[in-house]
């Protein structure tokens, strides 16, 4: 009887973990994004994007994103196959970034993925996201982060 009880508790704990967010950190969000891109699952890719990114890039239109996916798919798949994370940096509890190894980044591409913390976890955004920029400026002003080129 005690063995059954322990087994039941173990199963319950596993079931509880199954409902965890796929976006607990920038690196794990990127992993979720990468799996969705390689698995040709555009709805899951969309879920990795921040609300502001969706608005800025696709006018917050899932239909627009789904129409763009066939055009963007190959480029995104090639990129996620190539990119290797060099650094994960949480600037504070609101923003962070991933820096990719320069040898894995195309010459005309940014070596960074930017992230914002939303209600359901860390989401991909763009450096053009006004909320990201404002949070970054505030982090710099408060000494939470120093821009690499700043003295």
Predicted regions and their residues:
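C-terminal motif of bacterial Sec signal peptides marking the signal peptidase cleavage site
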Residues: 13-15
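Short solvent-exposed beta->alpha transition segments
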Residues: 21-22, 27-32, 37, 42-95, ...
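Short, conserved catalytic or interaction motifs in soluble domains
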Residues: 18
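Well-ordered beta-strand positions in beta-sheet-rich domains
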Residues: 82, 110-112
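Low-complexity, intrinsically disordered terminal/linker segments enriched in charged
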Residues: 91-95, 104-110, 118-119, 123-151
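N-terminal acidic leader/helix
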Residues: 100-101
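Sec-dependent signal peptide recognition
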Residues: 2-9
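Short, surface-exposed charged micro-motifs
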Residues: 87, 112-114
